[in-house]
Amino acid sequence: MGKIRKLDEQLSNLIAAGEVVERPASVVKELVENSIDANSTSIEIHLEEAGLSKIRIIDNGDGIAEEDCIVAFERHATSKIKDENDLFRIRTLGFRGEALPSIASVSELELVTSTGDAPGTHLIIKGGEIIKQEKTASRKGTDITVQNLFFNTPARLKYMKTIHTELGNITDIVYRIAMSHPEVSLKLFHNTKKLLHTSGNGDVRQVLAAIYSIQVAKKLIPIEAESLDFTIRGYVTLPEVTRASRNYMSTIVNGRYVRNYVLMKAIQQGYHTLLPVGRYPIGFLSIEMDPMLVDVNVHPAKLEVRFSKEQELLQFIEQTLQDAFKKVQLIPDAGVTTKKKTKDESVQEQFHFEHTKPKEPSMPNIVLPTGMDEAQEEESAEKPSVAPQLWQQPKQEWQPPQSLVREEESWQSTSKPLIEEKAAHNEQEWDHHEEEFELEELDELQNIEEIEMNGNDLPPLYPIGQMHGTYIFAQNDKGLYMIDQHAAQERINYEYFRDKVGQVTQEVQELLVPYRIDLSLNEFLRVEEQLEELKKVGLFLEQFGHQSFIVRSHPIWFPKGKETEIIDEMMQQVVKLKKVDIKKLREEAAIMMSCKASIKANQYLTNDQIFALLEELRTTSNPYTCPHGRPIIIHHSTYELEKMFKRVM
């Protein structure tokens, strides 16, 4: 007898379940997506013990006809595609025909369904075997219950995490589905406790408010753009609202939530230097494209996709976000702590978005100082023409107490987040769900006006003083502004150096002692392949031995003391990417030089020097954050100040 044999259907389903049904969240995802494909407008999700004990999905969709009920639980049985051409034009969330048989093979499943024009069907399946099938009275739609998940695969059950972790995975996937389909009303219950309720009115901003809180919804910027191949819609938060994880960014492709690192990276690139290092925005982007441009048949879980025009899409996303930020005033407002409001007061105020039209400044015209000398060289870094004598003046004799001095190196984090999510993610406790949004509150979001769109210009600022040799105070008719002088000049210097090193030239700096690069054989061969490309960006390598190169000269724009670091970075790019990203290298060099050349904390300036600094800041393309993403300016509105002093109540 031969050794190779065909596996029976039951064992095949168990093997397939290993890919499709990894945990309770996988079951919820597959069943809810089936409900959406069935044109449901209302879906209820009931969980017990984070789905390990029981998962019940109730929808008002098209239902399943009696003759299709048994077939639906056979492998690769589906109503969503008919031939191979349909595989490349997929518009539905499901299409593989694997989910239902995989789920049924590792659980006790009960199905009640009806198309509305005939008696319903009641079906019970245990471990893939049909136990009972009968007609029953049922409303239109489907009610499917999955109990004792993984009862017959104890090895899989052993690897399940805690209740909180599994519940976190489920809520995360439900949140993403709610964002991708705001036209569907979703209710999520755990042990009879309601965790989420979306209205299903099609307003994704209401869904985001229900998930992340009203406060976050107030800080969202609408994103919308269209090209020949792509349409992008969504919301992203202002740069002042960030998180420590990428998990708060959601990308939707043709109505399907996907996990795609390059899309996340494109969103980050759209923010560019607006985000601090290691911080990420809260965002939701829905991308529509011809199904021929995206391959969703990559993995049974259908969370991964491939794009045929990936680079064009990434550039389009980056440019769309950058254009959106140019239309928005990005100076963060300082929060004001006030007395706790009554419930009625807070309900009235939490749905009011500030919207003020820009007014002409009422301050008198002030003649700024002119005729300043050219900047002097500080070490190897040439200074931009920003009131150069500011940065060379000796420090004053008086110094503030040491406890008040804040060295630049000590500021390693952005300001405290303005809000905390009501809807927790995996690592948070589920007590956050206790105070839930009522539907009436969410409906009021429809009338909320958009975030103030004043353009990307910094308003005129009139300095009134300096604190601790670090912060500049200025005012205009909108209130009080605090400016970090180091961050301000760092932004000015960065844009100067970025433009200075922006063009590829043949000017090179000869090295007194050649720099030797030792590589593995594989790395050596890859670099050797790209020698001509390296010459185009001004780096000339000579072979030195079997697996080494030497560098005798480098481009003149390399910052002093960082030459070997940039050369090593170029080698790593060639080895990993098989190309040199000169734009990224020059940007990093500009950041290095700008930080080194800028004034530090605890350096006192004259009024003329402060005026010059603020005027130069106004000429930059982004006067709101330093190249590392830290804020330059914080705003206290006149109204906030009056509230602090109880002039208004």
UniProtKB/Swiss-Prot annotation:
Residues 388-402 have a biased composition (Low complexity). It comes from the Bacteria. Pfam families: DNA_mis_repair, HATPase_c_3, MutL_C. Keywords: DNA damage, DNA repair. GO terms for cellular component: mismatch repair complex. Residues 339-414 are annotated as: Disordered. One of its GO terms (molecular function) is mismatched DNA binding. SMART domains: DNA_mis_repair (SM01340), MutL_C (SM00853). Residues 342-360 have a biased composition (Basic and acidic residues). GO terms for biological process: mismatch repair. This protein is involved in the repair of mismatches in DNA. It is required for dam-dependent methyl-directed DNA mismatch repair. May act as a 'molecular matchmaker', a protein that promotes the formation of a stable complex between two or more DNA-binding proteins in an ATP-dependent manner without itself being part of a final effector complex. Belongs to the DNA mismatch repair MutL/HexB family. This is DNA mismatch repair protein MutL. The gene is mutL.
